[in-house]
Amino acid sequence: MKRIAFVFSTAPHGTAAGREGLDALLATSALTDDLAVFFIADGVFQLLQGQKPDAVLARDYIATFKLLGLYDIEQCWVCAASLRERGLDPQTPFVVEATPLEADALRRELANYDVILRF
C-alpha cells in the first residue's frame, strides 16, 4: 500500500476543506496504517483548542481531531515556522499532539510519502 500524507494548510471554518480533510483522513485510516498528518501555513489553526465555530454558524469538527489516536494515527507534524509566523508557541496545548519540525525537516519527512492530499 502506498504511504499517504494529509496536509492541512487552510484555516478552519472559512471553507469546508478542513472538515473534508479530516473526514477523508479518518476514512483512509480504515484502509491503511501508513499515513501521516501535516499542519502547515494557516492549517496550524486547525490545532487550536477553544474555537467557537458556532459564532460564524460553522460546525465544530475540531474536537474530532482528538480521535486520531483511536484511529491509530500517530504521525502528526506541525511546521514550526508557520507557528512562529502566526504568533503561536510550539508549547501551546493543541487538540492533538503534533511534533514541531522546521521547514526543511518537514519537507524531508513529507518526501517519504507516495501520495500527498492537501486540504
UniProtKB/Swiss-Prot annotation:
Localization (cell): Cytoplasm
Family matches, as InterPro entries: DsrEFH-like (IPR027396), Sulphur_relay_DsrE/F-like (IPR003787), Sulphur_relay_TusC (IPR037450), Sulphur_relay_TusC/DsrF (IPR017462)
Gene Ontology terms describing biological process: tRNA processing
Segments forming a coiled coil: none
Top-level taxon in the UniProt lineage: Bacteria
Main localisation: cytoplasm
Keyword Cytoplasm: yes
Protein keywords: Cytoplasm, tRNA processing
One Gene Ontology cellular component: cytoplasm
Subunit structure: Heterohexamer, formed by a dimer of trimers. The hexameric TusBCD complex contains 2 copies each of TusB, TusC and TusD. The TusBCD complex interacts with TusE.
Family matches, as HAMAP family: Thiourid_synth_C
Functional note: Part of a sulfur-relay system required for 2-thiolation of 5-methylaminomethyl-2-thiouridine (mnm(5)s(2)U) at tRNA wobble positions.
Family, as annotated: Belongs to the DsrF/TusC family.
Protein name in UniProt: Protein TusC
Organism per entry: Escherichia coli O17:K52:H18 (strain UMN026 / ExPEC)
High-level lineage: Bacteria, Pseudomonadati, Pseudomonadota, Gammaproteobacteria, Enterobacterales
Encoding gene, per UniProt annotation: tusC
